[in-house]
Structures are given as C-alpha cells and as structure tokens.
C-alpha cells in the first residue's frame, strides 16, 4: 500500500445535538458511519481508523474489518479527538502525516483524500484542506463555510458568511484536513481564539496564530449530514445513484 507514513482518522461521536445518534442513521441499509468508512477505505491506505466513544459504533466498524480507537466522550472537537487517537496508534513514530475526515460525509470521494496527501507531501504547507469552486446558490445554506485564498492558494480567512463579499463564484470549504504531525501537535497546544469562537470554526485558531493553511481544489461538494434535512438529502442521493 502507498503512503505507509499516513494515518487517516475518522472521528465519530454517538451523541449529536441536531440529529439523534447521527452515526447510526441508515442510508439505504447501511449506517452513516459505515458508509463513511467504506468510502475512505477505497483510498487503500494502510492506516485507516475510526475513533469513537461508542461500543455500538465500534462494533459496526469491526464487523466490516475496520480498526477502531476508543477515545473519551468529553473531548471537545473532532481535531482534538483525532490527535488523541493518533497518540494511541501502535508504532505511531512512523506516522508523519494525519488526515482528519469527518464522520458525517457518506459519499466522500477517496480521490480527495489522496489529493490532500499528495499536496501535503509536495507543497510548502504543513496543513492542507480541500475546496470546491461553486456559485452563490450552492453555498447559501447556513451550515456552509467559504474561504478566501491568495493567488497561491493559501487560506486567508474562513467564514460562515459568503466571502469575498459581492463575488459570483466562491470556494466552498470541505471540512477535511491533512496535517504534518508537528502541525497537528502545535494546533492542539494552542488555546481556542476569539475568531474561532465567534465563527465557530476551529481552523481560525490556526490562522490567528500565523500558521499557513494550503488549499487544494477538488471536484465535488460532498454531502455532510448534520440535520434530519441533510439525512433525507443523503438518502435521496443514494437512491438516485443506486438506479444508475
């Protein structure tokens, strides 16, 4: 397998404020978290883990041959949970890069994960995240995040508001991150910041501390399941692709 120095970690908590037991919701006959894991597994990476506080989630992943790392339910963010899981990976001294994939993207494309890894290894950036070019109509939902970048693709700011103001085309932020190990360790050591808490976007902690984030373009906006409405959208999407 390629990229033996990379760990892909999928954080998944059973409790969710907006959608009860979100990881266990069915899309077709398969749970959300199993779908995410199976999509990520298509990248064919040696070190792929689901990290969770739930025996039920663990049972689902182990049943399909996946590896699980248990982490405490009180960990505040997905990135914190990712780091705690990384510390528990056997022989983690051989892991130089960590990719954090949200556990609510049932149709995430494996090619996006591989693109992050390639860019992380071959660019000047220690943190990389994917973006998609979209029109205004596609990003107007409140949960969507846009990013402004410079001419080299370096992130300047992330916001839940549409940025830059007045534009006709935007960069939609896909909430997946690739970290060099040292960058993840540094991120975890920094306290939450004003802009992070204001926008409710933990990546702003990075920018506020003068750490660069590189962006790489990918082709499609993945469905993220946070609400019942999102779940129904995902179910409909699955039904449509199943007919093909």
Swiss-Prot record:
Belongs to the KdsB family. GO terms for molecular function: 3-deoxy-manno-octulosonate cytidylyltransferase activity. CDD domains: CMP-KDO-Synthetase. InterPro entries: Cytidylyl_trans (IPR003329), KdsB (IPR004528), Nucleotide-diphossugar_trans (IPR029044). The lineage of its organism: Bacteria, Pseudomonadati, Pseudomonadota, Alphaproteobacteria, Rickettsiales. Its main location: cytoplasm. GO terms for cellular component: cytosol. Keywords: Cytoplasm, Lipopolysaccharide biosynthesis, Nucleotidyltransferase, Transferase. Pathway: Nucleotide-sugar biosynthesis; CMP-3-deoxy-D-manno-octulosonate biosynthesis; CMP-3-deoxy-D-manno-octulosonate from 3-deoxy-D-manno-octulosonate and CTP: step 1/1; Bacterial outer membrane biogenesis; lipopolysaccharide biosynthesis. Activates KDO (a required 8-carbon sugar) for incorporation into bacterial lipopolysaccharide in Gram-negative bacteria. This is 3-deoxy-manno-octulosonate cytidylyltransferase. It is found in: Cytoplasm. Its EC number is 2.7.7.38. It holds the Pfam family CTP_transf_3. It is an enzyme of class 2 (transferase). GO terms for biological process: CMP-keto-3-deoxy-D-manno-octulosonic acid biosynthetic process; lipopolysaccharide biosynthetic process. It catalyses: 3-deoxy-alpha-D-manno-oct-2-ulosonate + CTP = CMP-3-deoxy-beta-D-manno-octulosonate + diphosphate. It comes from Rickettsia canadensis (strain McKiel).
């Amino acid at each position: 397998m390629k990229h033996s120095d990379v760990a892909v970690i999928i954080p998944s908590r059973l409790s969710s404020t907006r959608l009860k037991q979100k990881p266990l919701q069915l899309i077709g006959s398969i749970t959300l978290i199993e779908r995410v894991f199976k999509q990520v597994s298509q990248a064919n990476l040696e070190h792929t883990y689901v990290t969770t506080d739930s025996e039920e989630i663990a049972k689902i992943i182990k049943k399909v041959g996946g590896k699980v790392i248990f982490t405490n339910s009180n960990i505040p963010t997905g990135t914190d949970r990712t780091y705690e899981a990384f510390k528990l990976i056997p022989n983690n001294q051989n892991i130089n890069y960590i990719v954090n994939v949200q556990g609510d993207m049932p149709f995430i494309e494996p090619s996006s994960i591989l693109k992050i890894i390639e860019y992380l290894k071959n660019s000047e950036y220690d943190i990389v995240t994917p973006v998609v070019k979209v029109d205004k109509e596609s990003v107007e939902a409140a949960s969507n995040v846009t990013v402004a970048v410079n001419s080299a693709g370096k992130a300047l700011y992330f916001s839940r508001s549409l940025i830059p103001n007045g534009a006709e085309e935007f960069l939609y932020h896909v909430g997946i991150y690739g970290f060099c190990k040292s960058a993840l360790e540094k991120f975890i050591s920094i306290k939450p910041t004003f802009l992070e808490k204001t926008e409710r976007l933990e990546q702003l902690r990075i920018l506020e501390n003068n750490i660069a984030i590189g962006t790489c373009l990918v082709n499609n906006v993945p469905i993220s399941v946070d609400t019942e409405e999102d779940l129904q959208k995902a179910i409909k999407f699955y039904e449509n692709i199943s007919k093909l």
